[in-house]
Structures are given as structure tokens and as C-alpha cells.
Swiss-Prot record:
Catalytic reaction annotation: 1-(5-phospho-beta-D-ribosyl)-ATP + diphosphate = 5-phospho-alpha-D-ribose 1-diphosphate + ATP
Gene Ontology BP annotations: L-histidine biosynthetic process
Keywords: Amino-acid biosynthesis, ATP-binding, Cytoplasm, Glycosyltransferase, Histidine biosynthesis, Nucleotide-binding, Transferase
Record pathway: Amino-acid biosynthesis; L-histidine biosynthesis; L-histidine from 5-phospho-alpha-D-ribose 1-diphosphate: step 1/9
Gene transcribed to yield this protein: hisG
Subunit structure and binding partners: Heteromultimer composed of HisG and HisZ subunits.
Protein name: ATP phosphoribosyltransferase
One CC-aspect GO term: cytoplasm
Length: 208
């Protein structure tokens, strides 16, 4: 009998975009997470289950072995790298860009640049690479407000269409990284359940 295989996924866009890949691997969820309160979803294989978690928590579940594989955004992985997991595949889904954005008509400032962002580690690494010292302000959402009320000079955030930036008088200025969702694996699980996991990887790869 095959070992139990647990796949960590988050609700919303990533789950929706991952469904065709799961189907290509003949893994069919038995319930719709958007309509169910269950956080552990059975599939058409009794030894394969889905763990529905927050997008930012998926790497943690995989790194600690609570899930064998999972899907996580590159933005999340850049913020919290772990020695216990590996990226297996760029799934080419949930694509966007991590960018610096600022007011269309930037005001002169005589202080060290203030950057509002949810992505503290990525922003810190980016500005360190440029040799520029900045003050980073941690926010969890509605980043676009910060420059409008002088909380920050610029923001570092994910940009998809750019419509939200435009609506708030901001423009993208600097590209930090291309973001997409990645298939990640727990290092120990990859050794002990290699065939099961590799079969899924190859089917995902063929469907991308």
C-alpha cells in the first residue's frame, strides 16, 4: 500500500490555478474548499489528501513535515527560506512581480528613504544589494495608502495589473523579482516517498 501523501495548498487563486495540475496527476479533491469548512480534504486516492492552509503557512507545514509537498508563492519562499524544503518546479501560475512603487509626482525628501512593505526580507536584501540604507515599515495590506499619508516614501509590493497602484496615484519604479507559485517538497519526504512524489512532479511538468 502507498504511504500517506499530504499536499499543502491555500484557498483562492493558487488553489484554483493548481486544480488543472492536480487533475493531470489524476488527483481529484472530493470536496470544494471554498464551500467546505474542512481543512483536510480527501481525494479520489485514499492515500492522498489535501491540507488547506494560509498561503504564508504552506512552506512551514512542508518544512516541518506536516505536509510532504505543497504549493507556495516565490514571494513567501523569499521571505522565509528553510533548509528543510526544496523547490521542485516553477508551476507558472499566480504570476506577478515584486516591485518598488512610488507616487507619480514624488516629493523631495531630506531623510533616509522610508519603504512600507509586507516583504521586509526581500526589500532589505534588494536595497542592501544596491548599497542603499532605508527604513523599512512593516505593513500587512493596503500598502498603497502609505505614500499618500506620508507614512512612507515608497512601497515594495506585488504588482499584477497595476490597476490598484494607478488608482492611488502610484507608479511601478523598480523590478525586484518575478513571482510565481512553486511546487515545494520536504527533504525527508522526498527521500522516503520519492516515487510517489516524482510521479506527481512529472505529471505536473507535462501539464505546465
Amino acid at each position: 500500500m502507498a504511504d500517506q501523501l499530504t499536499i499543502a495548498l491555500s484557498k483562492g487563486r493558487i488553489y484554483k490555478d493548481t486544480l488543472p495540475l492536480l487533475e493531470a496527476a489524476n488527483i481529484i479533491p472530493q470536496e470544494d474548499p471554498s464551500k467546505s469548512r474542512k481543512l483536510i480534504i480527501p481525494t479520489n486516492h485514499e492515500h492522498v489528501r489535501l491540507l488547506i492552509v494560509r498561503a504564508t503557512d504552506a512552506p512551514t507545514y512542508v518544512a516541518h513535515g506536516a505536509a510532504d509537498i505543497g504549493v507556495a508563492g516565490k514571494d513567501v519562499l523569499m521571505e522565509a527560506p528553510s533548509d528543510n524544503l526544496n523547490e521542485l518546479l516553477d508551476l507558472q501560475i499566480a504570476k506577478c512581480k515584486l516591485m518598488v512603487a512610488g507616487p507619480k509626482e514624488a516629493k523631495p525628501h531630506g531623510h533616509r528613504l522610508k519603504i512600507a512593505t509586507k516583504y521586509i526580507q526581500s526589500a532589505k536584501a534588494y536595497y542592501a544589494q544596491k548599497g542603499q540604507q532605508v527604513d523599512l515599515i512593516k505593513l500587512y495590506g493596503s500598502m498603497e495608502i502609505a505614500p499618500l499619508i506620508d507614512l512612507a516614501d515608497k512601497i515594495v509590493d506585488l504588482v499584477d495589473t497595476g490597476n490598484t497602484l494607478k488608482a492611488n496615484g502610484l507608479v511601478p519604479e523598480e523590478h525586484i523579482a518575478d513571482i510565481s507559485s512553486r511546487l515545494i517538497v520536504n527533504e525527508h519526504a522526498y527521500k522516503t516517498k520519492f516515487k510517489q512524489i516524482n510521479d506527481i512532479v512529472e505529471k505536473f511538468r507535462s501539464a505546465i
